[in-house]
UniProtKB/Swiss-Prot annotation:
Disulfide-bonded cysteines: none
Taxonomic source organism: Ureaplasma parvum serovar 3 (strain ATCC 700970)
GO cellular component: plasma membrane
Protein's cellular compartments: Cell membrane
Bilayer disposition of the protein: Multi-pass membrane protein
Name this polypeptide is given: Uncharacterized protein UU048
Keyword Transmembrane set for record: yes
Signal peptide bounds: none
Transmembrane segments: 33-53, 89-109, 127-147, 154-174, 193-213, 247-267, 285-305, 320-340, 355-375, 382-402, 411-431, 455-475
UniProtKB keywords: Cell membrane, Membrane, Transmembrane, Transmembrane helix
């Protein structure tokens, strides 16, 4: 009888283990499928938005001028703030862009993040996956279909944020009860959830009420900058020097920053409890790779924009061809890095050495690109150099991350910041080339600073970040060598 019970118990344990293993494998398959589907949709969304950027992101629309947010089918007046008419049109374009972009990016990133957190409970997360994807798709489609120039209609886009908040609220409640079972120590306290949701609601309320007040305090809801008391009051606060206005500004920014911090209480709680580990950051890098892939494909399209005065000379301007050598230099650096890295793999290597090699390579690339762009005035040359160099930089990052499995979380976060900066630089160069094309003739990014344009500022920032990192590593490397030498001297003295 005892043997029969023991045999039954053993069978039960084996069955439970097999069932659990099958469930994990099934959840892993579903998770990988959803991640692949989301990746394909994300890449498609970004590629289409960028290829049709002048029509979608800048609001030119499709078809005749009646379906455009600009007066003419050109971006020549984009960010022209010299008249109330252009000021209002540009404000509405920027407002539309920020609302739709925020909703699109937030929902896509949220889905990628949640797929990581719910690897074991993926089936239960499926409804939220679909709903977040639906909101992302709506935002994407509105970029292609919504081109209203009426303030009230454009301001109605904020209600997308209300829908997003309600979805977030339902997800956070679901996540709290699910995570409470798997990680009771971290999710035992529901106060963080309540604080985050309350302050998110207050921020949303501010975003919704502000446009409503704006359009209802003027003589006409169709005019935002003419005979509008709200606009006049805002201008006075920022321009009229008085103690009252100073206190209002300080109080506004203080409460805004406080509300933003408290609205992200859950995030800070996870950071403090070290839930954002190396694997989580690597998961984020996948989204960055998708974004870079879209930028890479789009830049190939950007080369097609006509610049009659920017054609490359055929043998009559040797200096320009010297500038283009930056691209060949970047490729040579990549080859040398790959050869050196492969050679090092055959011998024992330290993580500090490999990191130093990475940072030196990135610093050389960012410095050479900045210097060439600083002295070169041809947009097409800058576009070629940036296109090649950033591709090399991202390739170097990819090689380093692929070959080093035990990168610290802090370093991964820093590399992530540098990658985002590289992508932003590439996007700005692409948009600058689009705006300065013959059809649009807009030099917005070139007129921000008298001595340096926005592209050069971004490249300088990229170099500065790499230079700061290499300075830190050089000091750390010197300290390690000093400690080793000191230890060797002590050992030699003991032997004597």
């Amino acid at each position: 009888m005892m043997n029969t019970k023991t045999f039954t118990s053993v069978n039960r344990v084996i069955y439970d283990d097999n069932y659990s293993l099958k469930q994990q494998q099934k959840s892993s398959f579903i998770n990988q499928f959803l991640k692949g589907l989301l990746s394909a949709i994300t890449l498609l969304f970004f590629i289409l938005l960028l290829i049709f950027a002048e029509n979608t992101l800048f609001g030119l629309g499709f078809g005749d001028e009646n379906k455009s947010m600009m007066i003419s089918k050109s971006l020549n007046a984009f960010f022209d703030l010299h008249s109330p008419k252009y000021l209002q049109l540009n404000f509405l374009i920027v407002f539309r862009f920020f609302i739709l972009s925020f909703t699109l990016f937030y929902t896509l990133i949220k889905n990628f993040t949640n797929l990581y957190w719910h690897r074991a409970t993926i089936k239960k997360y499926l409804p939220w996956f679909v709903l977040y994807l639906v909101i992302a798709t709506i935002s994407f489609l509105l970029f292609f279909t919504f081109f209203s120039v009426w303030p009230k209609e454009v301001f109605n886009l904020v209600f997308l944020l209300l829908v997003l908040f309600l979805l977030n609220l339902s997800y956070e409640i679901f996540n709290y009860f699910i995570s409470k079972k798997t990680n009771p120590l971290l999710y035992d306290n529901y106060k963080n959830l309540i604080i985050a949701m309350v302050f998110q609601a207050l921020l949303l309320l501010f975003v919704i009420i502000t446009p409503l007040v704006w359009i209802n305090t003027g003589k006409s809801p169709n005019f935002l900058f003419v005979d509008n008391r709200f606009y006049t009051r805002i201008v006075d606060i920022f321009t009229v020097q008085s103690g009252k206005n100073f206190i209002i500004l300080i109080a506004f920014f203080f409460f805004l920053i406080t509300f933003i911090v408290l609205a992200n209480t859950n995030f800070f709680a996870l950071v403090i409890n070290k839930r954002y580990d190396r694997n989580y950051v690597k998961n984020n890098l996948w989204f960055i790779l998708l974004l870079f892939s879209a930028i890479f494909i789009w830049l190939l399209r950007v080369f097609a924009y006509k610049h009659e005065n920017e054609n490359l000379p055929v043998g009559n301007n040797h200096l320009l061809w010297v500038y283009i050598l930056q691209s060949f230099f970047a490729i040579i650096i990549l080859i040398l890095y790959m050869v050196f890295t492969l050679k090092k793999r055959l011998s024992v290597k330290s993580s500090l050495n490999t990191l130093l090699n990475l940072v030196v390579t990135q610093t050389i690339l960012s410095l050479s690109l900045f210097l060439v762009t600083l002295f070169n005035s041809k947009s097409v040359v800058s576009l070629i150099n940036v296109f090649i160099t950033i591709t090399v930089q991202m390739s170097v990052f990819g090689i380093y991350i692929f070959q080093n499995k035990n990168i610290s979380t802090k370093l991964l976060v820093l590399l992530k910041v540098i990658m985002i900066l590289i992508i932003l630089t590439a996007a700005i160069v692409g948009f600058d080339y689009l705006l300065t094309s013959d059809h649009h003739n807009n030099y917005l990014f070139s007129n921000i600073q008298p001595k340096m344009n926005l592209v050069q500022i971004m490249l300088l920032l990229n170099f500065s970040l790499n230079f700061t990192l290499i300075s830190y590593l050089t000091i750390k490397f010197a300290m390690v060598i000093f400690k080793i030498n000191k230890l060797n001297k002590e050992l030699n003295n003991e032997k004597k």
